[in-house]
């Protein structure tokens, strides 16, 4: 018996596990907000220590990336992400987790073809599309005369 796509979708909806959507959204919001709150606390601490605003922002990002890498290495970030969903994936910590996870997973294949190459299967598209988006945005601003040459 061949099943159509609509029949399959109906069967999945009927038999698949149902998650509490509002609770999942609220939890993702709280986790993402908590990560951002931690970032703001770190930034305020850097500013209170007399560090310039721009450098404080850079140090905050680096601190969150390092913390995410450590938590990923210990296996704790995956547990958080399993429950928090996009709340833990959208901030910069989610990107760091994705890169470090790939590096850990393919470590046995060697440093170059394992860790080095597989890290960028995740990071590569983000870097490419991020750079492309920045170039397009810069071109639009330049064409509008908002960006000095």
Predicted regions located by residue number:
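Hydrophobic core segments of alpha-helical transmembrane domains in multi-pass membrane transport
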Residues: 31-41, 64-72, 134-138
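Hydrophobic alpha-helical transmembrane segments
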Residues: 25-30, 58-62
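Short, charged cytosolic
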Residues: 1-9
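Juxtamembrane boundary at the C-terminal end of a transmembrane helix
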Residues: 136-149
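Mid-chain, well-packed structural core segment of small domains
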Residues: 76-111
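Individual transmembrane alpha-helices with interfacial aromatic-anchor signatures
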Residues: 116-132
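Cytosolic juxtamembrane amphipathic/interface segments immediately preceding
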Residues: 9-24, 109-118
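Loop-to-helix transition at the N-terminal end of transmembrane alpha-helices
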Residues: 49-68
